[in-house]
Amino acid sequence: MKEVNLLSSAAVLRALYDNKKDIYDVIAEFIRASIKQKSIRVFDSMECTELLLSEFGFRIPEAIVKSCLKNRLKKNGEIDLIDGRYCVSSKFSLNEQAEKDFSTSRNNYEKIITELTAYCESRIIVPIDRSRLKSDFEAYLLNPEKAKEYTSIIANFILVNEETPEFRSKINQIEEGLILYTGIRYSPNLSTLGHWSSELTIFIDTEHLFN
């Protein structure tokens, strides 16, 4: 069974959001991918919610999953609702760009982990627990203040590489994807996700204004 990693999934989330801008369309792509990966033909919303967790590490409220199934996949004719269960139709398909984003994200993540492992091995005498290192890396990006076994060396690794544009871009995509994911889990209104709807007042010092 393939390893599930929230960070690579978060990076895909950010990439798809850039392309689509509608968060329900983005979640729908993850639903399509999970259905395709497990080759399931019949399911309900709860099973689909569990698929998103097992395949991508996403804990998404079932109500949101239901909305995506009804207003995206069913509306497009990709699935049919029969006796309370969804059945995959012949129109079901995963967007080619989405597939490319999934593949690119996983490759980018594995490259970062490989570089991180090599960095740790060059500075730590004892053998590296790769599984723990991955877990601590995820924990660090989710909450840098929470100390783990490899927190210090992970912070050093990021500091050493942060001036490299490609590396910084990959880390930014993961971090921004995690922010979107948090919004999906806890926002009462997904339609406002990524938008600033309230009045914003900006104060600029005259020294900067006329420079």
Q: Residue ranges of each PLM-predicted region?
A:
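Noncatalytic, typically N-terminal accessory segments of nucleic acid-processing enzymes
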Residues: 2-211
